[in-house]
A protein has these predicted regions:
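N-terminal Rossmann/SDR dinucleotide-binding element
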Residues: 1-53
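Conserved active-site helix of classical SDR/Rossmann-fold NAD(P)-dependent CH-OH oxidoreductases
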Residues: 3, 81-82, 126, 130-137, ...
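Conserved catalytic-core motifs of eukaryotic protein kinase domains, centered on the activation segment
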Residues: 24-26, 64-71, 107-111, 159-160
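NAD(P)H-binding glycine-rich loop region in Rossmannoid oxidoreductase-like domains
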Residues: 38-76
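Glycine-rich NAD(P)-binding loop of the Rossmann-fold in SDR/ketoreductase-type enzymes
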Residues: 39, 68-83, 119, 123, ...
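Conserved sequence/active-site signature of Rossmann-fold short-chain dehydrogenase/reductase
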Residues: 39, 104-105, 154-156
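Conserved Rossmann-fold NAD(P)-dependent oxidoreductase catalytic core, especially the SDR/UDP-sugar
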Residues: 56, 82-123
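NAD(P)-dependent short-chain dehydrogenase/reductase
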Residues: 134-190
Length: 190
């Protein structure tokens, strides 16, 4: 996403803990990288003013990772959300885009899921994502546009490949072991 935005001519500030390394993105005249924790409200108050849009991707990003440390997951995925939205709105942000998850739908019998369906999150990870959606919508106003996306499993080529996602796990097994290991059997992936 960062490289695409830069290619389109946007100025981009990346705010990240950098737990996977600090030299992931190439240097670019329109790219500013700030190492920081989404829970640090004072740092957010310094960084956010002067920007037009926040694309909020910072979270513990799946159920297994979340379950390793539920209190950490809650502090990052839920507790830090309202302060981030309030700081963004008061800091002059015009557009706030939130990356939720398709897991907020829970398990549906219907083949096609749409935004009008009742949310039935099954885990704390997806429940907190649904809670954040509700919080964000309360802040929507004429001068603070909010947008929520609910991506399914995101996979594909990346400079920092994630091997905790099922599609990438299967690809890794196929390439390195010349076999595909099937796990479970009852899961449905959007």
């Amino acid at each position: 996403l960062v490289l695409l935005l830069l290619k389109k001519g946007y100025r981009v500030t990346v705010f990240d803990l950098m737990i996977y390394g600090e030299n992931v993105l190439p240097k670019h005249e329109k790219l500013k990288i700030v190492k920081g924790d989404i829970r640090n409200q004072e740092l957010l108050k310094k960084i956010i003013p002067g920007h037009q849009c926040v694309i909020h991707l910072a979270c513990i990003s799946n159920d297994p990772s979340f379950e390793l440390n539920p209190s950490l997951g809650k502090s990052i995925n839920l507790d830090s959300f309202t302060p981030l939205v309030e700081i963004s709105k008061s800091g002059g942000i015009k557009l706030f885009i939130y990356a939720s998850t398709s897991s907020v739908y829970g398990i549906k019998n219907e083949k096609k899921v749409n935004e009008k369906m009742v949310l039935e999150p099954l885990t704390d990870y997806s429940r907190f994502k649904a809670d954040c959606e509700k919080i964000l919508l309360r802040y929507q106003s004429d001068n603070f546009t909010t947008s929520i996306i609910r991506p399914a499993t995101v996979c594909g080529c990346s400079p920092r490949q994630r091997l905790d996602l099922i599609v990438n796990i299967l690809t890794n097994f196929a390439f390195n072991k010349r076999e595909i290991k099937i796990f479970g059997g009852n899961q449905l992936r959007p």
